[in-house]
Amino acid sequence: SVFAFENEQSSTIAPARLYK
């Protein structure tokens, strides 16, 4: 997924902005 580069399921939990 675009938002969850680490895990596809992470997209539903939190967007990539949180990881960055």
From Swiss-Prot:
<protein>
    <recommendedName>
        <fullName>Protein PR-L2</fullName>
    </recommendedName>
</protein>
<dbReference type="GO" id="GO:0006952">
    <property type="term" value="P:defense response"/>
</dbReference>
<keyword id="KW-0568">Pathogenesis-related protein</keyword>
<keyword id="KW-0611">Plant defense</keyword>
<feature type="region of interest" description="Disordered">
    <location>
        <begin position="1"/>
        <end position="20"/>
    </location>
</feature>
<comment type="similarity">
    <text>Belongs to the BetVI family.</text>
</comment>
